[in-house]
């Protein structure tokens, strides 16, 4: 196994940019999205110092229940190593229920990640996405399993669960709280975020944003993780 693969397995596999996102179960038919998101650790400890990652993706919802998404570039700088591109990903969101049809709205996520780091395995991810809206308050839960595949793969499943609770002051301002837990490395984090959407006048286009900071709940998590996301949507 190369040094790069070892670093990916021992540090990068514990947290990637797609670990710090709470996926929505909703699909908007015919909408195209271009998204950039990432994170940066703010922790002087050697196993977290200068760690950061980012990824850019494009998606298009061909129908009202399926949204495929391609991650064109996934960048990572693991603590103690140089930054590099680490692979690509094909992700699918399936909306399983109509919004408001049942007590909660349900979707499903399924993805395949191809790693370009020599000696590192690919991975599949899957799991349910659940959202409950009550008035202006929305709560979203993700339950995601990850399994390494192909050469060098571990036989174990890794599990993470995520939570987002936001209050809609206006379309452009939704303050809230996000929480993340990864049982594979016992890292638990939670903190405030602000999100929103701006409609571009006289168009069918929108610009979404999300920024926040996660605080480490236990010693296995970074003390602070800064998050940022921007998304351009159009029909």
Residue map of PLM features:
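Transmembrane beta-barrel domains of Gram-negative outer membranes and organellar outer membranes
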Residues: 15-235
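Bacterial N-terminal signal peptides
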Residues: 2-10
């Amino acid at each position: 196994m190369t040094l790069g693969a070892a670093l990916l397995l021992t540090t990068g596999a514990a947290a990637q940019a797609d670990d710090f996102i709470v996926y929505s179960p909703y699909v908007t038919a015919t909408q195209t999205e271009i998204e950039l998101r990432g994170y940066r650790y703010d922790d002087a400890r050697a196993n977290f110092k200068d760690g950061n990652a980012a990824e850019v993706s494009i998606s298009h919802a061909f129908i009202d229940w399926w949204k495929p998404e391609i991650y064109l570039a996934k960048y990572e700088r693991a603590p103690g190593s140089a930054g590099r591109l680490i692979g690509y990903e094909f992700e699918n969101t399936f909306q399983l229920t109509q919004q408001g049809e049942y007590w909660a709205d349900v979707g499903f996520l399924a993805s395949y990640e191809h790693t370009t780091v020599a000696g590192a395995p690919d991975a599949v991810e899957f799991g349910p996405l659940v959202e409950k809206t009550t008035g202006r308050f929305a709560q979203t839960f993700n339950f995601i399993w990850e399994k390494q595949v192909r050469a060098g793969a571990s036989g174990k499943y890794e599990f993470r669960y995520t939570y987002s609770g936001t209050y809609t002051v206006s379309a452009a301002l939704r303050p809230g709280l996000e929480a993340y837990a990864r049982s594979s490395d016992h890292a638990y984090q939670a903190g405030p975020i602000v999100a929103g959407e701006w409609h571009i006048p006289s168009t069918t286009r929108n610009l979404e944003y999300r920024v926040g900071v996660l605080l480490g709940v236990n010693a296995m998590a970074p003390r602070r993780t800064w998050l940022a996301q921007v998304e351009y949507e159009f029909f």
